[in-house]
Amino acid sequence: MILTALRGALGFLTRIPVGRDEAAWAAFARSPWTFPVVGYLVGGLVALSLFVPAPAPTVALAFVLAVYAVTGIGHLDGVADIGDAAAVHGDREERRRVLKDSALGVGGTVALALVVLGLATAALGLVEVAATAGDGGPLPPVIGIVVAAEVGAKAATATLVCVGDAPHEGLGSALTGESSPGATLSVFALAAPAALLTWPQVLPGLAALLVALATAALVARWSRRRLGGVSGDVLGATTELARVAALHAGVIAWTRF
């Protein structure tokens, strides 16, 4: 059951070729704790791109490419849809209609640009951390920050899965309908150790985790008021927004405190 759930999580949350089948999906849908576990693996893989021997802008590009090579670009569709919905001056029904529209509007374009730009600038900050940080801890600081941010982003998404209600049938309801608020305990328990990955400095890892969760809270509040609940697009957008926010928080905490 555990391995099947993890395989389902890897198949859904990444592009790692583990195969997809109904049993794995069903096990994953009932196991939100798999989100942060996958975050540890994804964070470790994409962090390796920061050690490319190249100028900082090239390393930043490599990092962005690595993120989407490992996780895919499916969540960016959620960013675009939520961006378009946020730009609508109308009621919930109008915003939901926009979510189902495959055309990309101005709001979605701006949202996508900001997320990718945010990811690239965070990578530049990580390059600076790598160049100036010492080797006092068990892991290079940039690896700790990236993994903590990815675990935080996945835990943030899992939290919405556990506490959210979908406004309509779809991916959101397929996940939220299988979990309960009590499942957040296992999510938080598995995500918490990521705060120690920047040891001996705990603040950068802790900041990344907490800011990711705070991002989820803000997205959840907005989606409930504007959309009536947590849809699949909201979950995808939460992952992307929380990752960017968490990376910047980790870099700021390392360089300024």
From Swiss-Prot:
Signal peptide: none
Protein's recorded name: Adenosylcobinamide-GDP ribazoletransferase
Single biological process term from Gene Ontology: cobalamin biosynthetic process
Catalytic activity line of the entry: alpha-ribazole + adenosylcob(III)inamide-GDP = adenosylcob(III)alamin + GMP + H(+); alpha-ribazole 5'-phosphate + adenosylcob(III)inamide-GDP = adenosylcob(III)alamin 5'-phosphate + GMP + H(+)
HAMAP family: CobS (MF_00719)
Transmembrane residue ranges: 28-48, 50-70, 110-130, 199-219
UniProt entry keywords in alphabetical sequence: Cell membrane, Cobalamin biosynthesis, Magnesium, Membrane, Transferase, Transmembrane, Transmembrane helix
UniProt-listed NCBIfam families: cobS
Keyword Protein transport set for record: no
Keyword Transferase belongs to the record: yes
Enzyme category, top tier: transferase
Function of the molecule: Joins adenosylcobinamide-GDP and alpha-ribazole to generate adenosylcobalamin (Ado-cobalamin). Also synthesizes adenosylcobalamin 5'-phosphate from adenosylcobinamide-GDP and alpha-ribazole 5'-phosphate.
Top-rank taxon: Archaea
Topological relation to the membrane, as annotated: Multi-pass membrane protein
Pathway given in the UniProt record: Cofactor biosynthesis; adenosylcobalamin biosynthesis; adenosylcobalamin from cob(II)yrinate a,c-diamide: step 7/7
GO molecular function: adenosylcobinamide-GDP ribazoletransferase activity; cobalamin 5'-phosphate synthase activity
GO CC, alphabetical: plasma membrane
Native organism: Halorubrum lacusprofundi (strain ATCC 49239 / DSM 5036 / JCM 8891 / ACAM 34)
Pfam families named in the record: CobS
Organism classification: Archaea, Methanobacteriati, Methanobacteriota, Stenosarchaea group, Halobacteria
Cell compartment(s), UniProt: Cell membrane
Enzyme Commission number, as recorded: 2.7.8.26
